[in-house]
Regions:
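Bacterial N-terminal signal peptides that target proteins for export
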Residues: 1-12
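Extended active-site neighborhood of metal-dependent phosphoesterases/phosphodiesterases
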Residues: 133, 208-342, 346, 370-375, ...
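Short, solvent-exposed loop/turn elements at domain surfaces
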Residues: 158-167, 198, 258, 322-325, ...
Length: 509
């Protein structure tokens, strides 16, 4: 049986090589090409996952990258060839089978020492595909005709840093959350960021909590915290139960800044073909330094919710900036929010969500007594997005490690889902502050250039591990949210209601 499977596999790859033109090794995915009569051939038998394929998954992507808005990615053992993206397509009564080449994706040369234990391959998924697999593993092949069930999770990695060691072995629920979310059968999954928390070597005294095989530790000589071993342990393996279920939109968080885990984020999770080396260190004398802070371009994807109803999600990079004050980062960040506003111009029949890691309206723990204290997060984002939020029915964020919904009159509500597995924030009360975002405790502006927002009309907070499921309501612009724990218990429900399309309200209980 094994010999037969090998002969079938060799035959498949040989046919794929004839049908697909040879392409140079580069980081970009090939443009999909039409399937012609010469591509007709019998449907191949399904093969077991290849032993060299460690993971395969589908990323949501901008249409400029893939007309289907989907990119297939594979993580392999080093020293192996990129597999083919194997697809089928229905044409009338016939099933057409075709292989597409996947191309290697690499971090910049100065970061490669830290990522030598894997090989990553990528390919745009052509539009109209019925099924797809990589290395024998099924991956989502198409966005459903109507998407009315969305999974949401974020802030997932296991925290390992001096003074704060999470029990990764027994009390880190990411794998359980991923499996439970997958069982809910979402049609797409949204993840606003923060995947990598193992930023220090596990102390020998805490090996029972955070030890890993192979060990996860920053690589000597690298001016950043992550590695391929770390990404496999902290994200790829525990999330893998979700991969066959739905395409995922990944956005980087502050933990994926270039001096932390940015190299791995752009290698594994960013869908764009030109971003893999975004965080390559810069040579300064004998020692490399992290790439300078920068905001990557805003991008968006869209899908149908129901006939006459479509949703667009704008993806804004907020990995950098400051939470508790307004800084000179605001003009740089402002460009990303302007780009998002431009791609979500209001149209009849369209709804828009803004997805950005740092909340624009988020309530952190504590009340503070110092005049300059503010309980609001993140003030750089609130300032940078000022007067640019009118297109959205909702803002989706994470960053603070809890689940929260904040409503401010005249603004889209901010849903925070930052409870996907990393160490939670304080389990205390989160009352409505006396003043709105961009205000000090005294009510005065944090920065005179940016007037404070009104006092919040409602804040709902739950400090518990879990995820969210958004289900489209019958009315346009309206969604229902179920907030669930790792075991499937529902600990909160929310309703996003916006009957006129101009006054969204998110009520939770």
């Amino acid at each position: 049986m094994l010999a037969t499977s090998r002969r079938v596999l060799v035959s498949i790859l040989a046919v794929g090589a004839v049908l697909a033109p040879a392409m140079p090794a580069q980081a970009s995915s090939p443009a999909p090409t039409p399937i012609g009569r010469g591509d007709l051939r019998p449907l191949r038998p399904k093969l077991p996952p290849g032993p060299s394929t460690l993971a395969s998954y589908t990323l949501l992507a901008p249409v400029s990258v893939s007309p289907s808005q989907l990119v297939a990615r594979a993580v392999l053992k080093p020293g192996t060839n990129c597999p083919a993206l194997a697809t089928t397509k229905k044409v009338g009564t016939q099933t057409i089978s075709r292989n597409y080449p996947m191309l290697e994706r690499t971090v910049g040369p100065k970061a490669r020492t830290a990522f030598a234990t894997v090989k990553v391959c990528s390919a745009a998924i052509p539009a109209g595909i019925t099924s797809a697999s990589v290395g024998g593993r099924t991956v989502p092949a198409a966005i459903p005709a109507n998407v009315n069930r969305i999974g949401i999770m974020a802030d997932t990695g296991c925290r390992v840093e001096p003074g704060r060691i999470q029990d990764c072995a027994k009390a880190w629920p990411l794998a359980q959350i991923s499996a439970r979310l997958a069982a809910q059968k979402p049609q797409v999954i949204l993840d606003p960021g923060d995947y990598y928390y193992r930023e220090s070597a596990c102390p020998t005294t805490d090996w029972a909590k955070c030890g890993a095989n192979p060990p996860v530790t920053p690589v000597a000589g690298m001016p950043f915290k992550d590695s391929s071993n770390g990404w496999m342990t902290d994200a790829i393996k525990p999330m893998s139960t979700m991969f066959p279920v739905a395409p995922i939109a990944f956005l980087r968080g502050n933990h994926e800044a270039c001096d932390r885990a940015g190299n791995g984020f752009f290698l594994f999770l960013d869908p764009r073909p030109t971003t893999a080396s975004t965080c390559e260190p810069v040579a300064v004398g004998a020692h490399p330094v992290p790439a300078s802070p920068a905001v990557t371009d805003t991008w968006a994807f869209a899908f149908s919710v129901a006939p006459g109803r479509r949703l667009k999600v704008a993806m804004v990079d907020s990995a950098y900036g400051t939470d508790d004050k307004v800084t000179n980062w605001v003009p740089t960040q402002n460009k990303a929010y302007k780009q998002a506003a431009a791609v979500t111009t209001k149209q009849a029949g369209w709804e828009s969500w803004l997805m950005t890691h740092r909340p624009i309206f988020g309530r952190q723990a504590g009340n503070g007594f110092a005049p300059n204290f503010t309980p609001w997060v993140s003030n750089d984002q609130a300032a940078a997005s000022r007067n640019l939020l009118g297109n959205y029915q909702m803002i989706l964020s994470s960053h603070i490690h809890l689940m929260q919904a904040v409503q401010i009159k005249g603004q889209p509500p901010n849903l925070v889902v930052g409870n996907g597995g990393t160490m939670l924030d304080a389990n205390t009360t989160y009352p409505i502050p006396n003043f709105g975002p961009l205000a000090k405790n005294t009510g005065q502006p944090i920065d005179p250039q940016y007037p404070p927002y009104p006092k919040a009309s409602s804040i709902w907070t739950k400090v518990a591990f879990g995820f969210g499921i958004a289900t489209a309501a019958a009315s346009k612009n309206s969604w229902n949210f179920s907030m669930q724990g790792p075991g499937g218990n529902v600990f909160g429900t929310c309703a996003l209601v916006n009957p006129t399309g101009t006054a969204p309200n998110l009520g939770c209980k």
